[in-house]
Swiss-Prot record:
Keywords, in A-Z order: ATP-binding, Cytoplasm, Helicase, Hydrolase, Nucleotide-binding, RNA-binding
Species the sequence originates in: Helicobacter pylori (strain ATCC 700392 / 26695)
Protein role: DEAD-box RNA helicase probably involved in RNA degradation. Unwinds dsRNA in both 5'- and 3'-directions.
Keyword RNA-binding listed: yes
Subcellular location: Cytoplasm
PROSITE patterns: HELICASE_ATP_BIND_1, HELICASE_CTER, Q_MOTIF
Residues covered by the Helicase ATP-binding domain: 51-220
Region feature Disordered, mapped onto this chain: 445-492
Motif DEAD box in this chain: 168-171
CDD domains: DEADc, SF2_C_DEAD
Annotated family: Belongs to the DEAD box helicase family.
The protein's name: DEAD-box ATP-dependent RNA helicase RhpA
Catalytic reactions of this protein: ATP + H2O = ADP + phosphate + H(+)
Top-level EC class as recorded in UniProt: hydrolase
């Protein structure tokens, strides 16, 4: 049955139209029921523009960042148009195993009332087991390029004529060196297949690929201004290099996030920070590319099921990681580029919920942060790392064990100081040694480099120094209560 929708323009700007509801997009009642049960309220810009185009059978090239609702943008119209003819009707190609599994879960959820059957094909899983699943006549296949190509070359997939082919996170597949595999995969696909290409950026190799495999596509572009989620509060803290782990621990204590992701630059750093947090009794788990498939899946499931509430991850998790309820994202280092920053913070502030994105920077990274802030055209506010609050000190004192050596030291000190004076001095020392990050004078020196002010140091600052109000919109953090182509693809 054809949908009687008005013709679509060949290029769509994300700001061009009013925002409709899902009921306006031409989806079946059974699909809409799953949409609303999944917690969606209204379509995101990419969903608003892509869904009608896909329903009409048009090829689509869409540029939109992670976290904008791309999966539902192609999944919903695909589910809507499935015929249940006992063949693989749609193929989704994606760069990583994690993303493949998440897309499969999303399609299963959105296809609940249409009984959509999926199969997930990726490396690291038994080929024999995958072949058994493929023989059960799934309607949608989600696959990583390498394993899919292996199946095709060895003729393990019979009657493989998908009507729709999706290339998701195309620029990531370029970065991972999969473009030659993609071209070879297209040798096995029918030329009449509808092609949907989604990418966060559009480097030249991706544009050249699109020119080869797409026919008269609808072009959709969701500008960066649509991407910076206003539900995400962005802030940064200036620290010294050696204070990163302690700063994360302090912020976890004072922010008390329900569920958080800490992004690190390296796999080794992810392991080390996870081990540090675990040793301090935080429910932490790690995720990075050196972990085997079983451990990676175990970490993701532990985080999803709240067995762990802190996920320490490299950028392997920043693309496509779709876990609900993430209240905070921490950047252990300033990300290497703006793209990475946007992808990372997109893990929070989803489905209309508020989120917090926190970045740790050193004085040397400050100018780069300002440049990044200008690029994303969004304010990242400067805050000061909070000190230990009174409740924490009382708890620390209450839990502290008194040894014979401490008793002996106490007796010596009370001969020098009055007991009340001794307590005050020890509390002052506790507050001074609990300081993390730069003091007011050091922050001023970064903001006003022309002024002759002392360089940042590790010198401890009395608590009353920190009590002075920040300048220029700063806020004091409140404590909570407790590329080339090997050959041209053939379209046949």
């Amino acid at each position: 049955m054809e949908l009687n929708q008005p013709p679509l323009p060949t290029e769509i700007d994300g700001d061009a139209y009013h925002k409709p509801s899902f009921n306006d997009l031409g989806l079946k009642e059974s699909v809409l029921k799953s949409v609303y049960e999944a917690g969606f309220t209204s379509p995101s810009p990419i969903q608003e523009k892509a869904i009608p185009a896909v329903l009409q059978g048009r090829d689509v090239i869409a540029q939109a960042q992670t976290g904008t609702g791309k999966t539902a943008a192609f999944a919903l119209p695909i589910i809507n148009n499935l015929k249940n003819n006992h063949t693989i009707e749609a193929l989704v190609i994606t760069p990583t195993r994690e993303l493949a599994m998440q897309i499969s879960d999303e399609i299963f959820k959105l296809g609940k009332h249409t009984r959509t059957k999926t199969v997930c094909v990726y490396g690291g899983q038994s080929v024999k087991k995958q072949c058994e699943f493929i023989k059960k006549n799934p309607q949608v296949m989600i696959a990583t390029p390498g394993r899919l190509l292996d199946h095709l070359k060895n003729e393990r997939i019979h009657k493989f004529v998908p009507k729709v082919v999706v290339l998701d996170e195309s620029d990531e597949m370029l970065d991972m060196g999969f473009l030659d595999d993609i071209e070879e995969i297209f040798d096995y696909l029918p030329s009449e297949a509808q092609i949907l290409l989604f990418s966060a950026t559009m480097p030249e190799p991706i544009k050249r690929l699109a020119d080869k495999i797409l026919e008269n596509p609808i072009k959709i572009h969701i500008a960066p201004s649509n991407i910076t989620n206003t539900d995400i509060t962005q802030r940064f803290y200036v620290i010294n290099e050696h204070e990163r782990a302690e700063a994360i621990m302090r912020l976890l204590d004072t922010q008390a996030p329900k569920k958080s992701i800490v992004f690190t630059r390296t796999k080794k750093e992810a392991d080390e920070l996870h081990q540090f947090l675990a040793s301090k009794n935080y429910k932490s788990t790690a995720l990075h590319g050196d972990m085997d498939q079983r451990d990676r899946r175990s970490s993701i499931m532990a985080f999803k099921k709240n067995d762990a509430d802190v996920l320490v991850a490299t950028d392997v998790a920043s693309r496509g990681l779709d876990i609900s309820g993430v209240s905070h994202v921490f950047n252990y280092h300033l990300p290497l580029n703006t793209e990475s920053y946007i992808h990372r913070i997109g893990r929070t502030g989803r489905a209309g919920k508020k989120g917090m994105a926190i970045t740790l920077v050193t004085p040397l990274e400050y100018k780069e942060l300002l440049r990044m802030q200008k690029e994303i055209d969004s304010e990242i506010e400067l805050f000061e790392i909070p000190t230990i609050n009174e409740n924490q000190i009382i708890k620390t004192l209450h839990d502290a064990k008194v040894s014979e050596g401490i008793i002996s030291l106490y007796e010596q000190l009370t001969e020098i100081f009055e007991p009340s004076q001794l307590v005050l001095k020890l509390l002052s020392l506790q507050f001074e040694t609990s300081k993390i990050g730069l003091n007011q004078q050091e922050i001023d020196a970064i903001q006003n480099p022309k002024e002759k002010t002392p360089k940042p140091s590790n010198k401890k600052t009395p608590q009353h120094e920190r009590a002075r109000s920040f300048k220029k919109g700063q806020h004091r953090d409140r404590h909570p209560k407790t590329n080339h182509y090997s050959k041209k693809p053939k379209r046949r």
